[in-house]
């Protein structure tokens, strides 16, 4: 997985070091090159294995708080090197980290609990995320990380792009920009064999058709949004850039902590009532964070740093999202979906509070102890509500890696 003696999430530097070692080991097959720089000047690296024109592109690190992808990417690269049949007529290309600036700010390589995870939490504001910025920014304002990613897609014209994502607590699921027939079965078998629940009602894919449990296909343009207030649209993200060349994108999500409550297909007795209750709690929780932010802001020397930008951006989403849950019919009536919305409603204020807490702790601000108690309480309640259990890191990597390979094999049959 990495050059580390212990099993933990590798840093970007460690992923690059491991990729460089792979390239040195098989120089006839592998190349490692720089394809751009981040806003802060950090290099963006692409590892390529094989020389065939037909290509798979694997992207790690698009969300800095989802750390499994770097380790999975290295595992898939090893498999491709060791299994010749995966390279037959196909080259593989690995963007080692799509957002190295964000990765430098998320600092929980071996979290012991959800509270520990949130103490080092960072996830940038939406317009600063490389995959999502095209959905909210005009082309002339796209960050260099986005331009590097779309440039690689333009160069390689992959039949499949796989982007490696994760969730803090829940189950595993796949989002597809076009269906991949045959993927659902190996995905489900892999998850079951590793005791990872399949998240059948993921709020990220609310209202999308499913080609199998936990495998969601994005609706066609013009389909109504489950959450009308959300500023982004996946159909305007980099996920759809591969469509210009006849390709598609698979987003593979794996959990750090699993919950066996996320795959319950039973109908919820009152989903609309439940969503209205969750909306009320979301508003109440967000107000607690906003009060701390308003109190502390005059004392802070820099109110435009990345942690505060991201914290405030998350809080700004809350009123519209709460209104969506109150006034829009539920996209799904299952217990799994209502549970996923419950988790979403916990994450937004918890993440905003966590990033604000990091700023306050750095300044030794008097509001920090109170906010730290709130982050601890919310983290514990989140874990208790969903009966969180840690997924061994090797299982996170194995399941995500298997799903990447299965997607490539089944999408290749479609691409022929």
At which residue positions do the language-model features occur?
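Short glycine- and acidic-rich boundary segments immediately preceding or forming the N-terminal edge
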Residues: 1-44
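Flexible, small-residue-rich helix->loop connector segments that border functional cores
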Residues: 76-89
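Short beta-strand-to-loop junctions in surface cap/lid or active-site-entrance loops
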Residues: 45-53
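Active-site/substrate-binding loop(s) of hydrolase catalytic cores
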Residues: 53-55, 68-69, 86-184, 188, ...
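Short hydrophobic beta-strand that contains or immediately precedes a catalytic carboxylate
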Residues: 57-60
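C-terminal accessory segments enriched in acidic
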Residues: 2-9, 181-416
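Di-metal (Zn2+ and/or Mg2+/Mn2+) metal-binding site signature of metallo-dependent hydrolases
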Residues: 63-71
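Conserved beta-strand scaffold positions in the cores of enzyme catalytic domains, especially
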Residues: 32, 46, 94, 161, ...
């Amino acid at each position: 997985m990495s050059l580390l003696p212990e099993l933990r999430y590798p840093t970007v530097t460690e992923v690059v070091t491991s990729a460089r070692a792979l390239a040195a080991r098989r120089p006839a097959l592998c190349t490692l090159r720089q394809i751009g720089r981040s806003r802060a000047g950090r290099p963006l690296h692409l590892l390529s294995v094989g020389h065939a024109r037909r290509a798979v592109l694997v992207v790690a690190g698009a969300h800095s708080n989802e750390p499994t992808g770097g380790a999975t990417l290295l595992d898939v690269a090893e498999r491709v090197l060791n299994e010749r049949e995966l390279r037959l007529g196909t080259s593989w290309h690995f963007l080692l980290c799509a957002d190295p600036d964000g990765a430098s700010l998320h600092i929980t390589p071996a979290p012991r609990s959800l509270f520990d995870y949130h103490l080092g939490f960072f996830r940038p504001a939406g317009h600063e995320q490389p995959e999502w910025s095209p959905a909210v920014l005009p082309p002339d304002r796209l960050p260099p990380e986005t331009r590097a990613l779309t440039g690689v897609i333009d160069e390689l014209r992959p039949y499949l792009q796989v982007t490696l994502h994760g969730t803090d607590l829940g189950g595993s699921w796949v989002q597809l920009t076009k269906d991949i027939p045959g993927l659902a079965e190996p995905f489900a078998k892999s998850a079951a064999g590793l005791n990872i629940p399949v998240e059948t009602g993921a709020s990220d894919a609310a209202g999308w058709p499913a080609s199998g449990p936990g495998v969601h296909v994005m609706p066609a343009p013009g389909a109504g949004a489950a959450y009308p207030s959300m500023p982004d649209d996946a159909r305007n993200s980099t996920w759809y850039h591969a469509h210009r060349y006849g390709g598609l994108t698979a987003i593979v999500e794996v959990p750090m902590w699993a919950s066996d409550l996320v795959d319950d297909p039973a109908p919820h007795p009152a989903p609309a009532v439940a969503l209205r209750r969750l909306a009320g709690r979301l508003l109440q929780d967000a107000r607690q964070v906003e009060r701390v932010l308003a109190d502390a802001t005059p004392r802070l020397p820099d109110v435009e740093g990345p942690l505060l930008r991201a914290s405030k951006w998350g809080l700004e989403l809350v009123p519209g999202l709460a209104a969506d849950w109150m006034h829009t019919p539920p996209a799904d009536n299952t217990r799994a979906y209502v549970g996923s919305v419950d988790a979403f409603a916990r994450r937004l204020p918890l993440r905003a509070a966590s990033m604000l807490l990091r700023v306050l702790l750095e300044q030794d601000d008097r509001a920090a102890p109170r906010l730290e108690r709130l982050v601890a309480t919310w983290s514990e309640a989140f874990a208790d509500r969903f009966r969180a259990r840690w997924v061994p890191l090797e299982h996170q990597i194995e399941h995500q890696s298997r799903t990447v390979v299965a997607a490539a094999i089944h999408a290749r049959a479609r691409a022929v």
